[in-house]
Design a protein with these regions (language model features):
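Single conserved hydrophobic/aromatic residue that forms the stacking wall/gate
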Residues: 156-166
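Helical element adjacent to the flavin cofactor pocket in flavoenzyme catalytic cores
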Residues: 60-77
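Glycine-rich active-site loop/strand segments that organize a redox cofactor
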Residues: 22-63
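Beta1/beta-strand and adjacent pyrophosphate-binding region of the FAD-binding site
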Residues: 1, 148-153
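FAD-binding core/adjacent interface of flavoenzyme oxidoreductases
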Residues: 24, 72-146
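Glycine-rich Rossmann-fold phosphate-binding loop(s) that bind the pyrophosphate
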Residues: 17, 153-156
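Helix-loop-beta segment of a Rossmann-like dinucleotide-binding subdomain
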Residues: 42-59, 85, 94-96, 143-149
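Glycine-rich FAD pyrophosphate-binding loop
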Residues: 6-27
Length: 166
């Protein structure tokens, strides 16, 4: 989005609560890789020089790639700025954005928060059952899991390393 806005000469800023791609770095499991191979999961004008075209880049490399791309574009990224509230203005166009560093007035806002901001657990297992439930946002590797049977809902990226562990 920033690339296209910049190319059209539209002034904008990108606010990042922490570093660029922080969730890739610290809020995902150890074995996470991109959803596609390097030849496919890339942006125009920036290839993965150190990753083979058919390799699915690991999360650390993806995070660095996003940083490299922002730098290449000279994108107006402000890191360490938390957006606390976005409110549509009442009697005038635009929005008031309240951040950890003050207030920003904007005509338009693009909310690109990414998925899964708040972990959700299926309401199947009673809390006092003694069964460990671990959301993917807290999962790092199979070493966190108790011995015994495991049920993984939806994530092959977590299921496969868990299966290999036994």
């Amino acid at each position: 989005m920033s690339e296209h806005l910049g190319a059209m000469g539209i002034p904008h800023i990108v606010l990042e609560r922490k570093r660029i791609a922080e969730r890739w770095r610290s809020e995902r499991w150890d074995s996470l890789v991109a959803n596609g191979p390097a030849w496919h999961d890339r942006f125009p004008g920036l290839k993965f020089d150190d990753v083979g075209p058919d390799v699915f880049p690991p999360k650390e490399r993806m995070a660095q790639y996003f940083e490299d791309y922002a730098r290449m574009l000279n994108a107006p990224v402000r890191t360490g700025v938390e957006v606390r509230r976005v409110k549509r203005n009442d009697k005038r166009p635009g929005f008031t954005v309240t951040t950890s560093e003050g207030t920003i007035e904007a005509l338009h806002v693009v909310a690109a928060t990414g998925p899964f901001q708040v972990p959700t657990y299926p309401n199947i297992v009673p809390e006092d059952s003694g069964i460990q439930q671990l959301h993917s946002s807290a999962y790092k590797n199979p070493g966190q899991l108790a011995d015994g049977a495991v049920l993984v809902l939806s994530l092959i990226h977590i299921s496969e390393p868990t299966r290999r562990r036994g």
